[in-house]
Amino acid sequence: MLRGKHFPVIVLGLVLVLMVGVVNCTPSVSDGECDAVKAELDKANAELSELREVKAELDKAKAELAEVKAASLEELLRERRSVRDYADAPLTQDEVLKLLWAGQGTTRAWGGRTAPSAGALYPLELYLVAGNVENLAPGVYKYKPEENKLTHVKDGDVRAGLAAAAWGQACVREGAIDIVIAAVYERTTRKYGPRGETYVHIEVGHAAQNICLQATALGLGLVTVGAFNDAGVRIIVGMSQDEIPLYVIPVGRKT
């Protein structure tokens, strides 16, 4: 760690560098004195390098803080609201991944995730219906928690079709994206039997609330939608037969 007493040494080093560029010992200066000055200069240079590293870390931290609005959990809970009207403006890929990570991101080396899961069985699957995302082609993508990445499912902007499956709710069509949460019930029911269905429903609530709070932190608007035709959503998104849609969450910039 740097201490205040080191700064005179740093200043001395800078003065020496500016005046002579390098230390050249003269016959009037003993070898011991010359070596001592060189040692101080080397020490000053090392601490200058450390200062630069500290500054770089601070700059990086400031940039990261600027991406997400600093707020306590209490503030986020107070500010969270359902938003159904969105500006015609794109989201960034970074924002999208932050939202998906909040819902099902991996937080432990063994695979633990952001939302609690009965038996750590993780029956949920997250799909991204992208319509207006910077540098991301419109289409459907599936979230891979282990890599925090998207895999391509199908091309094309399907927001209008998804809105039709959600009984014509305009917010589903007008959001920059829709996050669709599906469940593979069998992952949980094979251990817990019929009770496992309840555990899945509890878990999707955990994941959705995480996404809501992340959106609030990012200054984005969203609403959780549960009214839709299951078969229609499954076909439009391109889900497998064992995946049942539970939530459609449109997200966009606030107007």
Regions found by a protein language model. Give the residues of each.
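Short, low-complexity, disordered segments immediately C-terminal to signal peptides
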Residues: 29-41
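Conserved hydrophobic/aromatic beta-strand scaffold that supports enzyme active sites
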Residues: 142, 178-180, 248
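Secretory targeting signatures
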Residues: 1-30
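A glycine-rich helix N-cap at a beta->alpha junction
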Residues: 238-255
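Small-aliphatic-rich amphipathic alpha-helix that forms the alpha element of a beta-alpha
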Residues: 80, 99, 126, 177-187, ...
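Solvent-exposed coil/turn segments that connect beta secondary-structure elements
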Residues: 104, 131-133, 145-146, 182-186, ...
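N-terminal amphipathic, basic helical "cap/leader" segment at the start of enzyme domains
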Residues: 41, 47-48, 53, 58-174
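Short, surface-exposed helix-loop/turn micro-motifs enriched in polar/charged residues
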Residues: 118, 222-225, 241
